[in-house]
Amino acid sequence: MNRPLILVSNDDGISAPGIRALIDVVSEIGDVVVVAPAGPQSGMGHAITINSTLHSSRISPKESEVLEYSCSGTPADCVKLAINELMPRKPDLCVSGVNHGSNSSINVIYSGTMSAAIEAGIEGVPAIGFSLLDYRWNANFNESKDFIKKITENALKNGIPNGVVLNVNIPSVKKSEIQGIKVCRQAKASWVEEFDKRKNPFGQDYYWLTGKFVNNDKGEDTDEWALNQNYISIVPVEFDLTAHHAIQELNEWNFK
C-alpha cells in the first residue's frame, strides 16, 4: 500500500529543533519531503519573494529516505516552490512547525508557520500548523509527539474541509498533564505595541518592537482558554477573508 506523501515546512528554519521533531513524527506515517527556510523567518506572515530570485538546495544525503531542501525564501515561498517544482507529485498533506512559541489567537495573522500551512491550503493541499507554547530553542518537543501523530493521522483518514487549515497549539507541559484536545474558536485578543527607542552611533533613532499580549476574551470556547487549562487547541482557520455579515450593510451605502 502506498504511503501518503507529506510536505513539511516551518518558519524557524530547517535546522530548528521543532521541525526536526515534526519530521521524526510524520516519517512514521508517510513519505516525507521537507522544504524549509535556510534561516529564521518568524513573523514573516504570508510574505513572498517577488523582487529577487529564490534558491534551493538539497541538504539530505542521497541515501536518506527523507528529501530535505533548504530554501532562501519565506515560509510561503517554500510551500509554493515545493508543490510546484520540487515534489514528485502533489502532497496528500502539508504540516508546518513545530513552531517555537504560540500561534494562538491573533498571532495566526503574523505567523510564518501558519502562512506556510495556509499557502498549502490555497494550493488545494490539506494542511496543519503546529506550535508549542515554548519559545526556547531547546524546548522539549518529545512530550507533544504522540498528540501530533494522532492529529496528523486523523487529518489523513478523515480529511480537512475545503478552504480550511488547522491551527494547532500545544501547551508546554508533560504528556501526562495534557487534559485532552479541544476544537475551539480563535480568541479575540491583541497586542499592545511598545517600541524601545534608541540612538545609533550617528545619533539616528532606531526602534525595537516589543509589546504585551492582551486577552480580554473570557469565552470558554476559545483557544486561549483551552491552552490555559492545558488542553491542546485546534482552531479551523479559513483563508477566505470575506466578512459575509457586512455585505448587506455595505450594500446600503449610497455610491451614486
Where are these regions (language model features)?
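Short acidic, Gly/Ser-rich segments with clustered Asp/Glu that frequently serve as metal-coordination loops
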Residues: 12-20, 201-202, 209
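A cross-family phosphate/adenosyl-ligand binding-site feature
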Residues: 2-9, 17-85, 89-90
